[in-house]
Amino acid sequence: ETIARKEEKESVDKLRLWLIENNFNKGINIDEDTKRYYPYNNFASHIIGFCGSDNQGLGGIEAKYDKILSGEKGRITRVKDGSGKEIDGTVEQYINATDGNGIITTIDMGVQSIVEKYLEEACIDNKCTDGGNVVVMDPTNGNILAMATYPTYNLNKPYEIVNNEISEKWDALSTKERNEALQAMWRNKAIADTYEPGSTFKLVTTSAALEEGITSPDNSGEFCCSGSITIAGVRIKCWRYYRPHGSQSLRQALMNSCNPIFIGLGQKLGVETYYSYLERFGFLNKTGIDLPGEAKGIFLDKSKVGPVELATISFGQRFEVTPIQMITMVSTIANKGKRMKPRLVKGTINSVTGEIEEFQPECTR
């Protein structure tokens, strides 16, 4: 019977010493095995993922690129008859095991380290009980330079809960509750969680309006904020309704984050056109990033969007998107309208020859 698997060398060495000191040489066998070791412990844990007891990838890059990383086991093949006896004249075939290949990530360790450090500080200082995430992306090629979720977990101890409140009552939890707690800890918020983007989404409304020729950036006095706007009988306030922004250009309206101006632009665009831009920016589908567990945005069906719904969408409310969708949108604008597919792996290294195979960036629009 197997008592324990994948134990740390330090623990096994202590057991060996105890067996020797107590002259205990029967009944207990120690078989050497290998397992994945992560030298940086918590670093980029939600990106890298980890392996199970059978060395199969269970999350992150480990799961997505499991076949490339795993290699193939060696084996011996023999030809036998129906009774299981080897057939005379046949030859055994020995097929050697092959190591898995290495992968080259897009992550910049310096940027990742800085992001993780300040994300942790921000979450602690602001008492973010649900944690947080940060994504840094190169707009020109889709390379993810950093992707951090807080809190992190130790890749060498992936079943060790980091939430003190949960760990204190761990023994009292049901199997279902334990699994849910672990899944929550492993969850990469940057790709799997959705949120309401708010005023940051005004970039989409601005881009669509400019592209359609409805407005221009610096037409002084083109817009006027009176503190609110009425759409289909519903009054929607500007955040600064108590002291309206007054006369503005588009650039100024964006700087002021003036809701009524973007509501008006959304009405001029109309539902069909606005949703076509949601599609072009990639909000109605997953980005296709090379990680498992990606979610997609949550929007009202186009047929159910009336003037009021379109008004709230125009300034970033009543729908949800993922962080990776948002940074893909911003990167598309920065890249002059070319939407690059976000990626975390840019190549592989052949374990035998050392040859590098580079993956080309993919433009999805």
Description of each model-found segment:
Residues 73, 127-131, 195, 223:
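Short, small/polar residue-rich loop motifs at catalytic or cofactor-binding pockets
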Residues 1-100:
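Small/polar-residue-rich segments within soluble enzyme cores
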Residues 24-29, 124-139:
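Short N-terminal helix-loop-first-beta-strand/juxtamembrane motif that initiates sensory/input modules
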Residues 3, 88-132:
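Conserved, well-ordered alpha-helix/loop/beta-strand core segments that scaffold catalytic motifs
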Residues 115, 134-145:
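Short, glycine-anchored, charge-dense loop/turn motifs used at functional sites
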Residues 81-92, 140-200, 204-365:
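Beta-lactam-recognizing serine transpeptidase/beta-lactamase-like catalytic domain environment
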